[in-house]
Amino acid sequence: MAAEKGESSDEERKPLTRDSMEYRDSSNSLHYSSSAASLSLAVIDRINGSTHDTGPNEIGRGDRDYSDDGEYDLEEADYIPSGGKPVQKKVKIVLGFLLFLCLSGWSLSFVLFLFGGHESSKTSNVYDDNISDTGSQGNKITLDEVLDGTWSPAFHDISWIPGPNGEDGLLLERGASISNGYLRVEDIVSRKDPKSSKKPIVLMQKAYFNVSGEAVFPSRVWPSPDLKTVLVLSNEEKNWRHSFTGKYWLFDVESQTGQPLDPAAKDQRVQLASWSPRSDAVVFTRDNNMFLRKLSSNEVMKITTNGGVNLFYGVPDWVYEEEVYSGNSVTWWADDGEYIAFLRTNESSVPEYPVQYFVSLPNGEISKPGEESYPETRKIKYPKAGAPNPIVDLQFFDVGKDEVFSVDIKGDFADSNRLITEVVWASNGKVIVRSTNRESDVLHVAVIDVLSRTGKIVRKEDINALDGGWVEPSQTARFIPADPDNGRLNDGYIDTVIYEGRDQLAYYTPVDNPNPIVLTKGHSEVVQAPSGVDLKRGLVYFVVAGNEPWERHIYSVNFDGTSIQPVTNVSESSYYDVSFSNGAGYAFLKYAGPQVPWQKVISTPANEVTFEETIEENNRLSERLRQYTLESKIYQYIDIDGFSLPVLERRPPNFNQTKKYPVLFYLYGGPGSQTVNKKFNVDFQSYVAANLGYIVVTVDGRGTGFIGRKARCVIRGNLGHFESRDQIQAAKIWAAKPYVDESRISIWGWSYGGFMALKTIEQDGGRTFKYGIAVAPVTDWRYYDSIYTERYMHTPQRNPGGYDNAAISNTTALANNIRFLVMHGTADDNVHIQNSLTFIDKLDVNNVHNYDVHFFPDSDHSIYFHNAHKIVYSRLADWLVNAFNGEWLKTYNPAPNDSIFRRAAIWVGLSI
């Protein structure tokens, strides 16, 4: 089919990342080079705050044994006993000679082993990335630097904003100098043209304003679509991971004055507020009820009245916020501003879980006299696996008629068996609704007509019957309006579908057509697509896992599925991210690795205007790399049970094939996740490899993302079984390598990774892994939330054996490990401390004591409260050093042994 009108030819649409890298054959590594930045970073900083994370500081390694050169040698750090009585000189000579012979024999055996053709499992397609070229001359990174953000690249967010008259390429900038305005809208192209007639629109001149003597300092801002009023949030307080409350204000651009969103209740905290597409009203939720404020009046209209502790309107409860929408809003305006769709959530039947706070007062209330010594308890409606779920239904508000209504859909799921995962407005009063059954393996897509108040299911997909898998909740479907002049006769939408065992993009038109045009045939899996849609030129932009699963590249495709073209340079193994302007004529391109990240604003290939501006080059980070020595990264595959699994091996600087290195396995491993990627990242694993001198291995095993649904879905109903087998088999492969000390192999993970660490050492029983570390682990999936757990495990009532197998329960096997460590925050609202406490109780009942535990008072799942983040990593590092130094090697005969041979061994620094 011919290209759409206005589309550039394929020859003109060349990759936009040409010459961003150069190769040096001498080290087989990539070295980044680019031009100098030309933009002040202040005006591009994230509209709602910086993305630069900070963390706590490092603690020292302590006063331990050192090698002759003054450096603590952890590459061969066996346990060294301290002390011992003097031995007579002759005995020293004789025993020294005997020990020399023994050591010589051991060395000969080692050499024969090393060069004797020792077999290991085959690996393929090995890729070596080394981002530092200082050799042995560079400084060592410290844990302090890793935790305080010293090694974090500077990243900035551009907030694209649609123009009042359909203009494309407009930026919302915050934090500019007073002379240019605190908040303004600027045309991207005019930034580099001082003679441009398109001048910036200043929305807020100052960084604060006063209302009746109260100074208002914005924490978040949302301009109205017509850019005449700004919705402002101040006094923000965090609720859960994504939700917050605060005071909301309306700021008039022309007069530069503000007023409360609700003048009659200006001090009451609001949970959510959003603009009408007409710019004439704001809908908001307060105390779980919805209200409407029209700008033409100071009065506030009540939309709902019965919201409260158990009934939510327009905002999600805990489990929907965490597991379905990853955000604080379930409110959607129709494009014409005539209707509002929202979820009503009834969690009356959901059991409560108490989260206790022993140090802090999260509710902000002072205890009553005499009750100061009692912990504060916050009760959460938390549906665990198999427990009653919240009842959620979709409702609508007719703005003109001031009326709330709902629409029944014939053949839909029962209330207790329904998850509403996406709502997308189409045109002419139609709305597309995606829902699944409770176990997320049957999908319904319905189209509702709010004008006629009717609805029908237009797509049904049984994912369990298709491949035994599930469907993940997502909010990426994109409505495509009809445009006969450009060949689109009907409305439609773009969605992610399962095609030939992978997630692909598909175009459904008209909206009730169940048979789509698959847009991305033959490509690797798409990632949160589509990323951008150019309606004018008939193009869809998407991010895809590239030639290898650890890559990310950007492509475009026509609406008819023809002419798939790369936007980034796919000849380089790279990791990109992107955000597109509203018309997709411009893109904010982020190169995230493997070399030093950079960011640019560019015109897209089909745009007639050519534009490129560098936003960030991270020159500070590049200079730092020239002074430090980092680990080398080896990307490869291993074959286990017929599956090709991605692996990242981090090797210490000055890696020596003839040495024996301890190995730390690091994993997350959750369904659909990915840990092996090409992002630039100097993290705790980098510290372990580059400073402590250990090898770190990460395996994305079965169940993880971007290696095909066959490998992903095999884990269903039996979490931890295949994933732990993959880690164990990988550890056996590494244990057989000549440069690995098979007696010093450990594994660690956080959250799902904590579960995986425990499940792996449980299944292995000390045969391969000797140590393990689990932070905030799930230990029994009956304790985790229903929406996440049942997606992968079904319900406990349906699959009791699977839940039994997945629980960490084989204490006999755990006792066969040398030692393991468990750490958890006591106020974890996500993975409850119940998991670790019941697990430790099992250990106590079965007289297992080869473990350590550390609880962090009042810390949630991220473990930050009162210096906890620093402690969790420093404790992890110290514990790992102690483990690999043999601190906890079992002594089967603890009776004192004063033999001459033992004392001689102590004298020469050996352990018997």
From Swiss-Prot:
Its EC number is 3.4.14.5. PROSITE patterns: PRO_ENDOPEP_SER. Residues 1-92 are cytoplasmic. Residues 114-912 are vacuolar. GO terms for molecular function: aminopeptidase activity; dipeptidyl-peptidase activity; serine-type endopeptidase activity. The active site is at residues 751, 828, 861. Residues 1-31, 49-70 are annotated as: Disordered. It catalyses: Release of an N-terminal dipeptide, Xaa-Yaa-|-Zaa-, from a polypeptide, preferentially when Yaa is Pro, provided Zaa is neither Pro nor hydroxyproline. Glycans are attached at residues 130, 210, 346, 569, 656, 810, 897. GO terms for biological process: proteolysis. GO terms for cellular component: plasma membrane; vacuolar membrane. Pfam families: DPPIV_N, Peptidase_S9. It is a single-pass type II membrane protein. InterPro entries: AB_hydrolase_fold, Pept_S9_AS, Peptidase_S9_cat, Peptidase_S9B_N, Serine_Prot_S9B/DPPIV. Residues 1-25 have a biased composition (Basic and acidic residues). It is found in: Vacuole membrane. The chain crosses the membrane at residues 93-113. It comes from the Eukaryota. Keywords: Aminopeptidase, Glycoprotein, Hydrolase, Membrane, Protease, Serine protease, Signal-anchor, Transmembrane, Transmembrane helix, Vacuole. Belongs to the peptidase S9B family. Type IV dipeptidyl-peptidase which removes N-terminal dipeptides sequentially from polypeptides having unsubstituted N-termini provided that the penultimate residue is proline. This is Probable dipeptidyl-aminopeptidase B.
